[in-house]
Amino acid sequence: MCMDDEKEIYWVGSSYKDLLEFPEQAKHDVGYQLHRVQNGLNPEDWKPFQTIGSGVKEIRISDGGNIFRVMYIAKFREKIYVLHSFQKKTQKTSRKDIDIARVRYKAIINREKNHE
Protein backbone atom coordinates (compact mmCIF):
# COMPACT_ATOMS: atom_id res chain seq x y z
CA MET A 1 0.00 0.00 0.00
CA CYS A 2 1.50 3.36 -0.97
CA MET A 3 1.11 6.60 0.96
CA ASP A 4 -1.75 7.69 -1.35
CA ASP A 5 -3.67 4.60 -0.23
CA GLU A 6 -3.46 5.40 3.48
CA LYS A 7 -6.74 4.93 5.26
CA GLU A 8 -8.10 8.08 6.84
CA ILE A 9 -8.51 8.15 10.62
CA TYR A 10 -11.85 9.16 12.11
CA TRP A 11 -11.88 9.93 15.82
CA VAL A 12 -15.12 8.91 17.51
CA GLY A 13 -16.50 10.80 20.49
CA SER A 14 -13.75 12.07 22.80
CA SER A 15 -11.13 9.55 21.61
CA TYR A 16 -8.82 12.24 20.18
CA LYS A 17 -9.20 14.58 23.16
CA ASP A 18 -8.51 11.64 25.47
CA LEU A 19 -5.40 10.72 23.48
CA LEU A 20 -4.08 14.26 23.91
CA GLU A 21 -4.02 13.62 27.67
CA PHE A 22 -1.43 10.84 27.22
CA PRO A 23 2.25 11.61 28.00
CA GLU A 24 4.29 12.78 24.99
CA GLN A 25 6.05 9.46 24.38
CA ALA A 26 2.79 7.50 24.58
CA LYS A 27 1.16 9.90 22.07
CA HIS A 28 4.14 9.45 19.75
CA ASP A 29 3.91 5.66 20.06
CA VAL A 30 0.16 5.67 19.33
CA GLY A 31 0.75 7.86 16.28
CA TYR A 32 3.37 5.46 14.94
CA GLN A 33 1.13 2.44 15.52
CA LEU A 34 -1.88 4.10 13.86
CA HIS A 35 0.34 5.02 10.89
CA ARG A 36 1.15 1.32 10.53
CA VAL A 37 -2.58 0.52 10.52
CA GLN A 38 -3.21 3.25 7.93
CA ASN A 39 -0.75 1.48 5.65
CA GLY A 40 -2.27 -1.99 6.01
CA LEU A 41 0.05 -3.29 8.74
CA ASN A 42 -0.79 -4.51 12.21
CA PRO A 43 0.40 -2.52 15.22
CA GLU A 44 3.46 -4.00 16.90
CA ASP A 45 1.56 -4.81 20.12
CA TRP A 46 -2.16 -5.42 19.77
CA LYS A 47 -4.93 -7.85 20.48
CA PRO A 48 -8.39 -8.42 19.06
CA PHE A 49 -11.20 -7.14 21.26
CA GLN A 50 -14.19 -9.09 19.98
CA THR A 51 -16.25 -8.40 23.12
CA ILE A 52 -16.75 -4.88 21.72
CA GLY A 53 -17.59 -6.07 18.21
CA SER A 54 -16.34 -7.76 15.07
CA GLY A 55 -13.03 -6.36 13.84
CA VAL A 56 -12.23 -4.26 16.93
CA LYS A 57 -8.55 -4.26 17.88
CA GLU A 58 -6.67 -2.74 20.78
CA ILE A 59 -3.26 -1.08 20.47
CA ARG A 60 -1.25 -1.66 23.63
CA ILE A 61 1.25 1.01 24.76
CA SER A 62 3.44 1.00 27.87
CA ASP A 63 5.18 4.18 28.99
CA GLY A 64 7.11 4.52 32.22
CA GLY A 65 5.08 1.89 34.04
CA ASN A 66 1.78 3.28 32.77
CA ILE A 67 -0.44 1.35 30.38
CA PHE A 68 -2.41 3.01 27.58
CA ARG A 69 -4.91 1.54 25.14
CA VAL A 70 -6.44 2.67 21.87
CA MET A 71 -9.38 0.68 20.50
CA TYR A 72 -10.07 0.96 16.80
CA ILE A 73 -11.76 -0.71 13.87
CA ALA A 74 -10.16 -0.80 10.43
CA LYS A 75 -12.35 -3.28 8.56
CA PHE A 76 -13.80 -0.62 6.26
CA ARG A 77 -12.11 -0.02 2.92
CA GLU A 78 -11.02 3.61 3.35
CA LYS A 79 -11.45 4.36 7.05
CA ILE A 80 -10.07 3.65 10.48
CA TYR A 81 -12.34 4.55 13.35
CA VAL A 82 -10.63 5.18 16.69
CA LEU A 83 -13.30 4.22 19.19
CA HIS A 84 -11.63 4.92 22.52
CA SER A 85 -8.30 6.05 24.00
CA PHE A 86 -7.64 5.54 27.69
CA GLN A 87 -5.12 4.81 30.42
CA LYS A 88 -5.52 1.39 31.93
CA LYS A 89 -5.42 1.39 35.74
CA THR A 90 -5.84 -2.34 36.41
CA GLN A 91 -5.00 -5.63 34.71
CA LYS A 92 -8.56 -6.02 33.45
CA THR A 93 -10.15 -3.45 31.13
CA SER A 94 -12.82 -1.58 33.10
CA ARG A 95 -16.52 -2.04 32.36
CA LYS A 96 -16.76 1.73 31.77
CA ASP A 97 -14.10 1.63 29.02
CA ILE A 98 -15.68 -1.43 27.39
CA ASP A 99 -19.12 0.23 27.44
CA ILE A 100 -17.79 3.45 25.89
CA ALA A 101 -16.14 1.54 23.06
CA ARG A 102 -19.20 -0.68 22.52
CA VAL A 103 -21.61 2.28 22.21
CA ARG A 104 -19.28 4.01 19.75
CA TYR A 105 -18.80 0.77 17.78
CA LYS A 106 -22.56 0.31 17.40
CA ALA A 107 -22.94 3.92 16.21
CA ILE A 108 -20.23 3.39 13.56
CA ILE A 109 -21.75 0.12 12.34
CA ASN A 110 -25.16 1.81 12.00
CA ARG A 111 -23.62 4.79 10.17
CA GLU A 112 -21.73 2.53 7.76
CA LYS A 113 -24.85 0.44 7.05
CA ASN A 114 -26.84 3.57 6.23
CA HIS A 115 -24.17 4.86 3.82
CA GLU A 116 -23.71 1.70 1.73
Regions found by a protein language model. Give the residues of each.
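ATP-dependent carboxylate-activation loops
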Residues: 83
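Basic, Lys/Arg-enriched alpha-helical interface segments
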Residues: 1-67, 76-79, 87-116
